[in-house]
């Protein structure tokens, strides 16, 4: 805890989010912009708010987020993971509910590397018999 802020780091794919929460009115600021402005798609905003809705703290915290790397979906997932960890830092009693919903676990799926002689990670060149 830094002063009256609680902190959580979230990661998803290549995105990393540093999340700071404190008691407040429910404002979420991502990289200096309101969450509605930063995440253009509705799905991104929904993903970010999931842990707050689950715990019933949607209007209870002011949240500041710094996020970098990856794309929109990866960043939304990283912010969700960071908010979850910050909520657990604030109140450890919330962990079972968040864990049950699957928000505590870091999604370990990463992009598979492209292999030599293949077009993509697994897509091979077309085989010609003759």
From Swiss-Prot:
Family assignment from sequence similarity: Belongs to the universal ribosomal protein uS9 family.
Which InterPro entries is this protein grouped with?
Ribosomal_Su5_D2-typ_SF (IPR020568), Ribosomal_uS9 (IPR000754), Ribosomal_uS9_bac/plastid (IPR023035), Ribosomal_uS9_CS (IPR020574), Ribsml_uS5_D2-typ_fold_subgr (IPR014721)
Q: Which NCBIfam families match?
A: PRK00132.1
Q: Tell me what gene encodes this.
A: rpsI
Residue spans crossing the bilayer: none
Q: What protein name does the entry list?
A: Small ribosomal subunit protein uS9
Coiled-coil regions listed: none
| Keywords assigned by UniProt, alphabetized | Ribonucleoprotein, Ribosomal protein
| One Gene Ontology term from the biological process aspect of the record | translation
Where is it found, in Gene Ontology cellular component terms?
Answer: cytosolic small ribosomal subunit
| PANTHER family named in the record | RIBOSOMAL PROTEIN S9, SMALL RIBOSOMAL SUBUNIT PROTEIN US9M
The terms under GO molecular function for this entry are: RNA binding; structural constituent of ribosome
